[in-house]
Amino acid sequence: MQKRITVRLSPRSVKSALDEVASLMSANRDRLDDAARDIAERICEKAQANFDAAWYDSLARGVRGEADVKCRVEKTGNGYKVVAEGPEVTFIEFGAGIYYNPPAGASPHPKGAELGFVIGGYGKGQGNQKAWGYYAEYGNLVITHGTAAQMPLYRAFEEVLQEMKR
C-alpha cells in the first residue's frame, strides 16, 4: 500500500502528519497480528487433525490406541504459539522405541536430535529394546513396542508453510 502524507511547515501540520503515521503503523500492526493469529489457527487445526489420526502402541491392551491430545492457540508477547497437550504428545511427535523408528540415539524427526528427543533417550533407555513394559496410572503393567514418530505438529507447520508459498 502506498500512501502519501503532505506536511506543511507548521506545528499543526507536522502533528497531523505524525498522527497519520502512527495510525498507519497501528493498522499495520493489527493486520500483522491478524495474519499471525490466522496462521497459528491453521497450524493448530491441521495439527489437531493429525493428532486425531495418530496412534500409540499398547500391546498389553492388545490395541493401538488413539491419541488423547488437544491443540490450542495462545497469544504471546509478540505473536502466537500453538500448544499441544496430552500424555502422548512427545511420543507421537518424536517417536519412542526402535521397533518403529531408526536406531537408538537417532531421531526420525527433523528437529528431534536438536531438541534432545532421540530414540531410546527417554526414561531408563528402555526404547533401545523392541518391546518393554511400564506401570500405568492404576498399577497396570503396559507392554509396548513404542510409537512411530508421526510428527503431527511438524507436518502441520510444513503444510501451512507450503500453502503460504503458493
Q: Where on the chain are the PLM-derived regions?
A:
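Short, Lys/Arg-rich flexible segments
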Residues: M1-V89, A96, Y100-R166
